Amino acid sequence: MTEFKLMENCKLGLMPNKGIAKILADKTPHPDQGNGIPRCELYLYVENIKLEFENAVKIGAKLISEIEDRDWGDKVCYFADIDGHIIAFAEKLNK
């Protein structure tokens, strides 16, 4: 599992398909059966959306939607990772 420290008391853990499949065993379909199908969205507020957008493009994340002002009050861009999960980088429009 890869862990990201988001705050002093908050970590985000991302587990590869094979790792979570061992834990879930036969209680759910194997995650590989749904590869490429969005199964979750990570919506991350960031300090510099343009920088995060450029970083995601640089590492080869699949662009889903460019940076846009959204009607819920955020500026957001969307990518998909190699497993098809959606990753959103967002900033509040009225900081």
Question: Where are the regions that the model predicts?
Answer:
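Conserved ATPase active-site switch/coordination loops adjacent to the nucleotide-binding site
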Residues: 83
